[in-house]
Amino acid sequence: MFLKKHKSKLLLVPRDEEQEDAGIVAVLTDRIPSVLLVRWFDLFCFGFAMCSYALDFFSDIGIAIFHFWAGRYLSGSLVLAFALLPSVIINIISMVWMLDDEMHWKRRAHPRRTGTFELNQKRFIPLSKMIVLCICQMGPLFWYYKALYYGWMFRKSSNENTDGEKRKCFSKMVEAERDATLLRFFEAFLESAPQLIIQGSIAASYFQNYYQTGTYPYWLYFQAASLLLSIISISWSVVVQNRSLRMIRDDKVNIWPHEAVLQFCWRFLTILARIITLVALVLIFGINVVPLISVHLLVTLVHVIFLQAIHIDACTHIEKLLLLINTFIHIFIPFNMVEGNTRWRYLTAYSVEFIEMMLVCWLLPLSLNTFPYIEKVQVGVPISFIAGIAIMMMYYQFFHPNRRQLIVTQSQEDLSLNVQKSVETLTPKLESSLEISGEQNTSQDLVSELLLDVEHEN
């Protein structure tokens, strides 16, 4: 268990060029489930992700403008910097992916993603519009919109199109969602999570200053709404990342809506407690919080190496990079980046968070004894954390998708036994019929056709 290397489930790295996702070939045969299903909940996830991304970004820009308008240039600069710099990085990556799709489209080759062309080989949208989207920092919305479009086309034409066309629509949808969720996941921890610490510290300081007057400036309400949107954005990005990975793998059971809601509640409550803890650390120690975060990173790096070591064939540098990314993510939330049992990983990571949270709650009265509602904060933060952990335990005990996988596996085994018995019964009859009729078809061909009929009937 300890120091054992596991396969990464955050990033699928091909061993060679032939293993790259081709959209038309590889994804259709290896990466998507045998039973294709697009629910209304899946389309809702795409739409909700688009709305939350846009609201989160523009709310941060609006808060920065409020600070500049009031003459708080340092606060405005910090908010704007942590909003724009990560967004520029994410949109550059998105633009590179779009250009990659455009290059493959022009060569009429199989692209690594089924990117900018529809089923009739036309562009999904013109390249000029893609560039405008990225300049406006809305590049990730392109991938969500494409996933939403092909998901809608799949549902709309389920009874009309052939199986091949439906599989193409499904593969385009899941590939677009894969790119979108990966971009959104990194955006959450490059922009939203650090932004929470910056804006939370600013809002807490001004809230304390204005508390005595009994009146609060209007921008403080907008900042509170922006903080709430950022927490929702981070929580949802983790949920949809997990859902997306399960959706495209035949060896995994997809997440049902109520399971996604439980995951969201678990993440939201634990992230809320964690962000308040980090903001309190900033208020108590100021710039001296950097060494404390460094100690946390060191502790996290140790248990991540022991419990979540990553193995990627012939990609040692990517292994190290993902290890560092996972360590950074653990500043804000525990995250399971590799295959395998999560029990010890979450137990260790959440234990570290709980110890840090209780130490901060114990230190709060000494340094922030004049902070409004300090007693309620001391009680509310642990309650939020414990409630989130309780939902997590309930999710893993009663609602985890793997509990349904056992039922699916058993039904598949029963189906295989029925098919095998049918073949054993029908083969002698087929052979005798072929001898009498003298037809050219072999018994193996007829058995194959009958197998499909038996599977369909079952």
Swiss-Prot record:
What this protein is reported to do is described as: Phospholipid scramblase that acts downstream of ced-9 and caspase ced-3 to promote phosphatidylserine exposure on apoptotic cell surface. Phosphatidylserine is a specific marker only present at the surface of apoptotic cells and acts as a specific signal for engulfment. Regulates apoptosis kinetics during embryonic development. Not required for engulfment of germ cell corpses.
What does the record say about the knockout? Delayed cell death process.
A GO molecular function annotation here is: phospholipid scramblase activity
Q: Classify the source by domain of life.
A: Eukaryota
Is Cell membrane among the key words of this record? yes
**This protein's name:** Cell death abnormality protein 8
Supply the source organism's classification.
Answer: Eukaryota, Metazoa, Ecdysozoa, Nematoda, Chromadorea
Q: Which GO terms describe its biological process?
A: apoptotic process involved in development; embryo development ending in birth or egg hatching; engulfment of apoptotic cell; execution phase of apoptosis; phosphatidylserine exposure on apoptotic cell surface; programmed cell death
What is the similarity comment for this entry? Belongs to the XK family.
Q: Which UniProt keywords apply?
A: Apoptosis, Cell membrane, Membrane, Transmembrane, Transmembrane helix
> So what does this thing catalyse?
a 1,2-diacyl-sn-glycero-3-phospho-L-serine(in) = a 1,2-diacyl-sn-glycero-3-phospho-L-serine(out)
Its annotated compartments are: Cell membrane
The impact of changing D163A is: No defect in apoptosis during embryogenesis
User: One GO CC annotation, please?
Assistant: plasma membrane
Q: Which residues lie on this side of the membrane: Extracellular?
A: 67-77, 145-219, 317, 375-378
Q: What stretches pass through the bilayer?
A: 46-66, 78-98, 124-144, 220-240, 275-295, 296-316, 318-338, 354-374, 379-399
Its PTM note reads:
Cleavage by ced-3 activates ced-8 function in promoting phosphatidylserine exposure at the surface of apoptotic cells.
Report membrane topology. Answer: Multi-pass membrane protein
What residue ranges lie in the Cytoplasmic compartment? 1-45, 99-123, 241-274, 339-353, 400-458
InterPro entries, per the entry: XK-rel (IPR018629), XK-related_scramblase (IPR050895)
What residues does the record give for site: Cleavage? D21, A22
Record keyword Transmembrane helix present: yes
